[in-house]
């Protein structure tokens, strides 16, 4: 959560949430006044998270962030995507950006965590990885900050407005 500031009361989407680990961290960060939507295309992961998160401020949904998610337009303060962007095709990148823009509030933020583009003990081949500069060029949103996340990851923050 370093680099995101206070999330108290915010509405957050954890896109491609997997088992919901980060969704649970966001749940505590947004508090009772906020809400976390956990989205993943894997039905079994979402069903397990629904059972685990019952009675919390987490709403677990099956869906694909690279297509129309049916989520309400301009409703999210933050969209978070962790270590999956490198696997998107060019069409999926376009779909992802379009859907993120649609569901983010004006001035809302997009946070993408990716693996650094150098040899690491884990992660995809180097030719699949994005440097933070390549990631900034790949999207038309306004880049805000690049934050180191440990030794092997970084988070690129964007604002939901077009680059000048």
What residues fall within each predicted segment?
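A short glycine-rich, Lys/Arg-flanked "PGG" loop and its adjoining helix->strand segment in the class I
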Residues: 94-106
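Conserved beta-strand signature within the Rossmann-like core of class I S-adenosyl-L-methionine
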Residues: 107-114
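A short acidic, Gly/Pro-enriched loop at the edge of an enzyme's catalytic core
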Residues: 7, 66-79
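Class I SAM-dependent methyltransferase SAM/SAH-binding core
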Residues: 13, 19-67
């Amino acid at each position: 959560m370093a680099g995101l500031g206070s999330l108290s009361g915010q509405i957050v989407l954890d896109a491609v949430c997997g088992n919901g680990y980060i969704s649970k961290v966001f749940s505590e960060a947004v508090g009772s006044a906020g809400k976390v939507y956990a989205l993943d295309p894997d039905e079994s992961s979402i069903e397990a998270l629904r059972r685990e998160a019952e009675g919390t401020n987490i709403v677990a949904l099956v869906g694909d962030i690279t297509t129309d998610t049916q989520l309400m337009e301009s409703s999210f303060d933050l969209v978070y995507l962790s270590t999956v962007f490198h696997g998107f095709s060019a069409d999926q990148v376009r779909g992802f950006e379009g859907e993120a823009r649609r569901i983010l509030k004006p001035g809302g933020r997009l946070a993408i965590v990716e693996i650094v583009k150098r040899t690491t003990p884990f992660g995809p081949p180097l030719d699949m990885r994005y440097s933070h500069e390549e990631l900034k060029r790949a999207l038309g949103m306004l880049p805000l900050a690049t934050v180191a996340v440990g030794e092997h990851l970084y988070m690129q923050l964007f604002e939901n407005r077009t680059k000048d």
